[in-house]
């Protein structure tokens, strides 16, 4: 019965190795070592990438919190600005009303005596 193929388990030595041919056995070992080195490098790079993604996620969470706080502050600012705008509008209207009433009173004070003077003659 044969076992299933597993690329991570080295194969049995070939007939050339068993017969003592050292040159034939060193080539597969060098290839295996080179491939293992590439795998180790890839694993290292992937671990770095995973670490960077994790850090990025933390920064994104922090940025999301700051964005939420800014949105709440902006909403409060908008409400306060509207309140101040309405208050200033009423203040402006009161000032205009006072000026109009003052002009009417001034005209009455000037025109009524003149009209009574000419009407009385």
Swiss-Prot record:
It comes from the Eukaryota. SUPFAM superfamilies: SNARE fusion complex (SSF58038). Residues 31-91 form the v-SNARE coiled-coil homology domain. Residues 119-121 are vesicular. The chain crosses the membrane at residues 98-118. GO terms for cellular component: cell cortex of cell tip; cell division site; cell tip; cytoplasm; endosome; Golgi apparatus; medial cortex; meiotic spindle pole. One of its GO terms (biological process) is intracellular protein transport. Residues 1-97 are cytoplasmic. It is a single-pass type IV membrane protein. Keywords: Coiled coil, Membrane, Transmembrane, Transmembrane helix. The keyword Coiled coil applies. Pfam families: Synaptobrevin. CDD domains: R-SNARE_Snc1. GO terms for molecular function: SNAP receptor activity; syntaxin binding. The keyword Transmembrane applies. Gene3D superfamilies: 1.20.5.110. It is found in: Membrane. Belongs to the synaptobrevin family. Involved in membrane trafficking during cytokinesis and cell elongation. This is Synaptobrevin homolog 1. It comes from Schizosaccharomyces pombe (strain 972 / ATCC 24843) (Fission yeast).
């Amino acid at each position: 019965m044969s076992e299933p193929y597993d690329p991570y388990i080295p194969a049995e030595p070939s007939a050339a190795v068993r017969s003592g041919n050292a040159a034939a056995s060193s080539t597969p070992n060098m290839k295996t070592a080179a491939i293992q080195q590439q795998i180790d490098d890839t694993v290292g790079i992937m671990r770095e990438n995973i670490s960077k993604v994790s850090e990025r996620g933390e920064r994104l969470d922090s940025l999301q919190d700051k964005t939420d706080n800014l949105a709440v502050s902006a909403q409060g600012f908008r409400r306060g600005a509207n309140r101040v705008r309405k208050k200033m509008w009423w203040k402006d209207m009161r000032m205009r009303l006072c000026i109009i009433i003052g002009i009417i009173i001034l005209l009455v004070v000037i025109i009524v005596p003149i009209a009574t003077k000419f009407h009385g003659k």
